[in-house]
């Protein structure tokens, strides 16, 4: 069967939730037995988000094959079973880099390189290549219609709509329908102007998804349909909700999936959304709550830790607990003490880079260890747990990471200079290598030790998890640290790199070098996060007596 394409654009304002809407539609179509993928086309000039500030851009989501991508790909994986790869996200910078490299090699035979056709052709090529083998490919265009940065992408999808034909393409446009309190009514004019802007570049939307803080009245739906030349049944209202996992059923109730399948002439069964109904039931019927102290350096923007936040919520669903996250700037622990940790039920230290706030993370790890509070360390959170234990238990007072102090007397954490990438190829780097794309990235095998908490939670000796790091535990210090009571319970497939450490004397102290948050989903959860929140629930009961 030929691939069918749904192109998703946004108008009026940014951050309308195109990614959530696209993922929710994909979830319904997948529930109808269709093989679905989603792509995100980002209009910024960066080659990828790998070196962008998390405070500006949000988290970097890592795919199975090691691509550093937009956080929307995390939404995609949480809503559908398809695993994202490097083909599912590319930027203006990536496209231009490829075209310029090919021009320097002489591949264009001296032609003048232009946005049309060279840039648009490369965009089209990547869209087609990344969509092969799927029944439906949903293509989300980042930014807002009217932005100068988005023009090459919009022109490319306009051309694809013509070349592939209407029988296999559909354009879905998200807009904002604001409510004006002074007038006491919703206003459709911004949507009308947004569609007018889209039509001016040759794209007529087939579906409008109208975001609002309330239900869209039938009269306004008719008005929007009249002025935008969109069928009234294809004007979909999408009011604000308290859980993004309600959106698939909301879109299903308005027959958006039927509009899609009829457009593409697809004969498939009705959507079975019972898994999503179970998620919503778990979410709305908790048996208790826990508070997790989340000690990070980018906490002013929760989206910097989007997948961790979601993984904690998923673990709450599986344990029937509401997870309250208390964000704590690690620098505050350095300057204001540990009072914010005193009534938490668990402590989590996530990944990060650089030495700012590192002492605060060490304080958090020490507080969890000394007070027997469940602790989960991720990536840098594992490294600080190792450093803290080395300093305060193993007697290595000069312990540190060479990332923070190249001349420390006990470098228990150091730069990885050689490793295998996700495809099995050897990678080399040193401290002078570029920052972008030079980490140990992607899904890697990890072997779990018998008798460990990790093995009990995962239920199997070999697992695969995704990585994003340059620094690793120095193997020369494993023996003295294990003699002092720490236990290494997970190694890389070649036994060269430490993946998991545990403190057997502690009720629940587990730290991992990989990023388990990237594989957690609302339907399945994740073994580590489920175990962590279960331990938090038990600690909460004991704490309250």
UniProtKB/Swiss-Prot annotation:
Q: Where is this region: Amidoligase domain?
A: 1-266
Residue sites binding CTP per the record = 14, 147-149, 187-192, 223
Q: Where does L-glutamine bind?
A: 352, 380-383, 403, 470
User: Where exactly are the transmembrane stretches of this chain?
Assistant: none
Q: Where is the active site?
A: 379, 515, 517
Q: What is the activity regulation comment for this entry? A: Allosterically activated by GTP, when glutamine is the substrate; GTP has no effect on the reaction when ammonia is the substrate. The allosteric effector GTP functions by stabilizing the protein conformation that binds the tetrahedral intermediate(s) formed during glutamine hydrolysis. Inhibited by the product CTP, via allosteric rather than competitive inhibition.
Any single GO CC term annotated in Swiss-Prot or TrEMBL for this entry? cytosol
| The protein's annotated pathway | Pyrimidine metabolism; CTP biosynthesis via de novo pathway; CTP from UDP: step 2/2
What sequence ranges are listed for the domain Glutamine amidotransferase type-1?
A: 291-542
Residues annotated as binding Mg(2+) are 72, 140
Q: Which GO terms describe its biological process?
A: 'de novo' CTP biosynthetic process; pyrimidine nucleobase biosynthetic process
Q: Where does UTP bind?
A: 14, 187-192, 223
Does the UniProt entry include the keyword Oxidoreductase? no
Concerning InterPro entries, the annotation shows:
Class_I_gatase-like, CTP_synthase, CTP_synthase_N, GATASE, GATase1_CTP_Synthase, P-loop_NTPase
**In the Enzyme Commission scheme, what number(s) does this protein have?**
6.3.4.2
Q: Which domain of life is it from?
A: Bacteria
For this UniProt record, the keywords arranged alphabetically read as follows: ATP-binding, Glutamine amidotransferase, Ligase, Magnesium, Metal-binding, Nucleotide-binding, Pyrimidine biosynthesis
Q: Other comments?
A: CTPSs have evolved a hybrid strategy for distinguishing between UTP and CTP. The overlapping regions of the product feedback inhibitory and substrate sites recognize a common feature in both compounds, the triphosphate moiety. To differentiate isosteric substrate and product pyrimidine rings, an additional pocket far from the expected kinase/ligase catalytic site, specifically recognizes the cytosine and ribose portions of the product inhibitor.
Give the protein family.
Answer: Belongs to the CTP synthase family.
Role description: Catalyzes the ATP-dependent amination of UTP to CTP with either L-glutamine or ammonia as the source of nitrogen. Regulates intracellular CTP levels through interactions with the four ribonucleotide triphosphates.
Tell me which HAMAP family the record gives.
PyrG
What's the subunit arrangement here? Homotetramer.
What is the name of the protein in this document?
Answer: CTP synthase
Q: What are the top taxonomic ranks of the organism?
A: Bacteria, Pseudomonadati, Pseudomonadota, Gammaproteobacteria, Alteromonadales
Q: Which gene encodes it?
A: pyrG
């Amino acid at each position: 069967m030929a691939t069918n394409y749904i192109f998703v654009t946004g108008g009026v304002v940014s951050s309308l939730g195109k990614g959530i809407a696209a993922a929710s539609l994909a979830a319904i179509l997948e529930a109808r037995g269709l093989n679905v993928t989603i792509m995100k086309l980002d209009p910024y000039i960066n080659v990828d988000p790998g070196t962008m500030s998390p405070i500006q851009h949000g988290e970097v989501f890592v795919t199975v094959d090691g691509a550093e991508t937009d956080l929307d790909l995390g939404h995609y994986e949480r809503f559908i079973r398809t695993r994202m790869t490097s083909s599912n996200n590319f930027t203006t910078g990536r496209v231009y880099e490829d075209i310029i490299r090919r021009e320097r090699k002489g591949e264009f035979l001296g032609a003048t390189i232009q946005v049309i056709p060279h840039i648009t052709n490369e965009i089209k090529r990547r869209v087609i290549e990344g969509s092969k083998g799927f029944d439906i490919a949903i293509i989300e265009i980042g930014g807002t219609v009217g932005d100068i940065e988005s023009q090459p992408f919009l022109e490319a999808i306009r051309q694809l709509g013509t070349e592939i034909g209407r029988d296999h393409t559909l354009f879905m446009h998200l807009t904002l329908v604001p409510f004006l309190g002074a007038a006491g009514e919703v206003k459709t004019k911004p949507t009308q102007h947004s569609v007018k802007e889209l039509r001016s570049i040759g794209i007529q939307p087939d579906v409008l998804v109208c975001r609002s803080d309330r239900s869209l009245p039938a009269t306004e739906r008719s008005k929007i349909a009249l002025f935008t030349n969109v069928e009234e049944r294809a004007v979909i209202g999408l009011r604000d909700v308290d859980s993004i996992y309600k959106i698939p059923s909301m879109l299903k109730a308005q027959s958006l999936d039927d509009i899609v399948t009829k457009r593409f002439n697809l004969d498939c069964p009705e959507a079975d959304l019972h898994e999503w109904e179970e998620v919503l039931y778990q979410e709305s019927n908790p048996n208790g709550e826990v508070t997790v102290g989340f000690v990070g350096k980018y906490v002013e923007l929760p989206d910097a830790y989007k997948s961790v936040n979601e993984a904690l919520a998923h673990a709450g669903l599986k344990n029937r607990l509401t997870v309250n996250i208390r964000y704590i700037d690690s620098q505050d622990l350095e300057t204001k003490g540990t009072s914010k940790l005193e009534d938490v039920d668990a402590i989590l230290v996530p990944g990060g880079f650089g030495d700012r706030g590192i002492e605060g993370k060490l304080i958090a790890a020490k507080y969890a260890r000394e007070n027997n509070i469940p602790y989960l360390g991720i990536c840098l959170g594992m490294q600080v747990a190792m450093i803290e234990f080395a300093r305060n238990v193993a007697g290595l007072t000069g312990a540190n990471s060479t990332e923070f102090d190249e001349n420390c007397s006990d470098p228990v954490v150091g730069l990885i200079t050689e490793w295998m990438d996700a495809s099995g190829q050897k990678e080399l780097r040193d401290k002078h290598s570029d920052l972008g794309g030079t980490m140990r990235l992607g899904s890697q095998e990890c072997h779990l030790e018998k008798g460990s908490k990790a093995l009990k939670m995962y239920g199997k000796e070999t697992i695969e998890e995704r990585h994003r790091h340059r620094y690793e535990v120095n193997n020369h210090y494993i023996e003295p640290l294990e003699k002092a009571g720490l236990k290494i319970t997970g190694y890389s497939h070649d036994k060269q790199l430490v993946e998991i450490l545990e403190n057997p004397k502690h009720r629940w102290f587990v730290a991992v070098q990989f990023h388990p948050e990237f594989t957690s989903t609302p339907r399945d959860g994740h073994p580590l996060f489920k175990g962590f929140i279960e331990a938090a629930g038990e600690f909460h009961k004991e704490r309250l007596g």
